[in-house]
Curated annotation (Swiss-Prot):
Stored PANTHER family: ASPARTATE--TRNA LIGASE, MITOCHONDRIAL (PTHR22594:SF5), ASPARTYL/LYSYL-TRNA SYNTHETASE (PTHR22594)
Protein name, as recorded: Aspartate--tRNA(Asp/Asn) ligase
Keywords linked to the UniProt accession: Aminoacyl-tRNA synthetase, ATP-binding, Cytoplasm, Ligase, Nucleotide-binding, Protein biosynthesis
Region (Aspartate): 196-199
Family: Belongs to the class-II aminoacyl-tRNA synthetase family. Type 1 subfamily.
GO MF term list: aspartate-tRNA ligase activity; aspartate-tRNA(Asn) ligase activity; ATP binding; nucleic acid binding
Annotated L-aspartate binding sites: 172, 218, 455, 496
Organism of this sequence: Burkholderia mallei (strain ATCC 23344)
Catalyzed reactions per annotation: tRNA(Asx) + L-aspartate + ATP = L-aspartyl-tRNA(Asx) + AMP + diphosphate
Entry EC no(s): 6.1.1.23
Site (Important for tRNA non-discrimination): 30, 81
Keyword Cytoplasm (UniProt): yes
Compartments (UniProt record): Cytoplasm
SUPFAM superfamilies referenced in this protein's UniProt entry, alphabetically: Class II aaRS and biotin synthetases, GAD domain-like, Nucleic acid-binding proteins
Length: 598
């Protein structure tokens, strides 16, 4: 039926007869000669239909966009002046001898080359959307990334082992997707949030190096970089320390980027402690392309009359930080007002600022509504610590540390990536990877009045912090590490707990008693008693990596059939109701939401 792909018909086939199959991308009637741009997964080729072959020409007159057709014809060079340098096949055309309509198409709801389609339209008609060249490129790129990951891991001695999709619900973290059991009435499986426990069990079982490219499921609120089901390159290895694990998977990411998109990442990724990342950038996934950093001012603002600064400076969880923007004096009041509204999204109550017109004049060279509320020592500290120069602007955030980090961190990125930031060299092009390490082991949950695991409860504390598990859990740092690239966390992992007594101590620190621990994790605690080896691993978000490589706006652009931000599939209309008989078989009765009283 087909001898060549359309997009691969080039000058090497001149003078040969070919058989092509594909879709009509565009049909043009030029004064009795019909031109068809025929498309398949490899690209386009121009087909010329002359009227001297009456049966073929009649068929060509009847085809429309997205008809699926077969063409047989002669490859010839294009006439002078009609060469299309933008196409791989742009120097040739196919003179059609025979045209068969394999399947007609109704009028498509949109043109495939329309770049202004809403995401709703695209996802509703996903099959047609996937015919678009960009989507074809994205999914083939995804395939190549997966292949190169497999090649690398295979060369390093990793074994691809599947783990269960129907498993036990262990509600520590995001909500599980639950699957009712028909056979065991009233009991439920959960879809895995990750293969975490199974891959640890595989290490205990002496498989030494495991990986799989697998689906994971989390019932959480969605954002541009989240899906209810997502794909991980999931890895675990025994008898390697934290540094060795990071080196191994840093090499994997370098290999993938080089072989798939020809990018040479740094020979060595910088390593930054979590505390430093939060202090300098307000984020545990800093975008190092942006050349702006926080300046710590909390201690210098404790005794100022300006309560907006002094109150958080004297509060246990408060912070005062500054962000100096070189040449920011050019920003208009309208720009500043826009940034003020922007930081409110992140909980900030406002945005204080100082323009440095002439630093040598001290406070007289500063322009700001807040200068009058600051004493000379605090002003000197601001100018000295930020390194402010004439023509700069300094923005301030003062609140709970989380609000300061979130709001000023978001402002840093917004300014850095703005047209102003690009014009003034505040952002670099390219790829800026790093490792963020030494995360807190626990976070305190005020509502539950207990510590919760910052990563997951199977992460090992640093050796020197083991004693804090029982005396001061808040001081514990974890052997955890995230790989960050251009402000995205693309991978995260840790060294795991391999001794039962340490795992039990962690459960106690989390207020998980012995009975609860046995009920939820007894199989793990049992396995750890049989000479479990030191082990650790990492999981990479395949969707995120491909999104970055493709320059896509959302991971929905690199997944064949994604869900919306409301966790719905617009193509299949899932989720959907099921009939009463199915529910009865599962021993389930639906409880309808209560209607508000009139």
């Amino acid at each position: 039926m087909r001898t060549e792909y359309c997009g691969l018909v080039t000058e090497h086939l001149l003078g040969q007869t070919v058989s092509l199959c594909g879709w009509v991308h565009r049909r043009r009637d030029h004064g009795g000669v019909i031109f068809i741009d025929l498309r398949d997964r490899e690209g386009l080729v121009q087909v010329v239909c002359d009227p001297d072959r009456a049966e073929m020409f009649a068929a060509a007159e009847g085809v429309r966009n997205e008809f699926c057709i077969q063409v047989k014809g002669l490859v010839r060079g294009r006439p002078e002046g009609t060469i299309n340098a933008g196409l791989k096949s742009g120097r040739i055309e196919v003179l059609c001898h025979e045209l068969n309509v394999l399947n007609a198409s109704v009028t498509p709801p949109f043109q495939l080359d329309d770049d202004n389609l809403s995401e709703t339209t695209r996802l509703t008609h996903r099959v047609l959307d996937l015919r678009r060249p960009q989507m074809q490129h994205n999914l083939r790129l995804r395939y190549r990334v997966a292949i190169e990951a497999r090649k690398y891991l295979d060369e390093q001695g990793f074994i691809d082992i599947e783990t269960p999709m129907l498993t036990k619900s262990t509600p520590e973290g995001a909500r599980d997707y639950l699957v009712p059991s028909r056979v065991n009435a009233g009991q439920f499986f959960a879809l895995p949030q990750s293969p975490q426990l199974f891959k640890q069990l595989l290490m205990v079982a002496n498989f030494d190096r495991y990986y799989q490219i697998t689906k994971c499921f989390r019932d959480e609120d969605l954002r541009a970089d989240r899906q209810p089901e997502f794909t991980q390159i999931d890895c675990e290895t025994s008898f390697l320390g934290e540094q060795e694990i990071r080196d191994l998977f840093e090499d994997m990411i370098r290999h993938i980027f080089k072989t798939t998109i020809g990018v040479e990442l740094d020979a060595t990724f910088p390593v930054m402690p979590y505390s430093e990342a939060m202090a300098r950038f307000g984020s545990d996934k800093p975008d190092l392309r942006v050349k702006l950093e926080f300046t710590e001012l909390t201690d210098a603002m404790k005794d100022v009359d300006f309560k907006v600064f002094s109150t958080p400076a004297n509060t246990k969880d408060g912070r005062v930080a500054a962000l100096r923007v070189p040449k920011g004096g050019e920003l208009t009041r309208g720009d500043i007002d826009g940034y003020t509204e922007f930081v409110r999204i992140y909980g900030a109550k406002g945005l204080a600022w100082i323009k440095v017109n002439e630093r040598a004049k001290g406070r007289d060279g500063l322009q700001s509504p807040i200068v009058k509320n600051l004493h000379d020592a605090s002003i000197a500290a601001i100018l000295e610590r930020t390194g402010a120069q004439d023509g700069d602007i300094i923005f301030f955030a003062a609140d709970r540390a989380k609000v300061v980090n979130d709001s000023l961190g978001a402002l840093r990125l917004k300014i850095g990536h703005s047209e102003f930031g690009k014009a003034n060299g505040l952002v670099e092009a390219g790829w800026k990877p790093l490792w963020v390490v030494d995360f807190p082991m626990f976070e305190y949950d005020d509502e539950e009045a207990r510590y919760v695991a910052a990563h997951h409860p199977f992460t090992s504390p640093k050796d020197e912090h083991l004693e804090y598990l029982e005396t001061d859990p808040g001081r514990c740092l974890a052997k955890a590490y995230d790989m960050v690239l251009n402000g995205w966390e693309i991978g995260g992992g840790s060294v795991r707990i391999h001794r039962e007594e340490v795992q039990s101590k962690v459960f106690r620190a989390l207020k998980i008693g012995p009975e609860e621990a046995q009920a939820k994790f007894g199989f793990l605690l049992d396995a750890l008693q049989y000479g479990a080896p030191p082990h650790g691993g990492i999981a990479f978000g395949l969707d995120r990596i491909v999104t970055m490589m493709a320059g896509a706006d959302s991971i929905r652009d690199v997944i064949a059939f994604p869900k919306t931000q409301r966790a719905q599939c617009l193509l299949t209309q899932a989720p959907s109701p099921v009939d009463e008989r199915q529910l009865r078989e599962l021993h389930i009765r639906l409880r309808q939401p209560e209607q508000p009283k009139a």
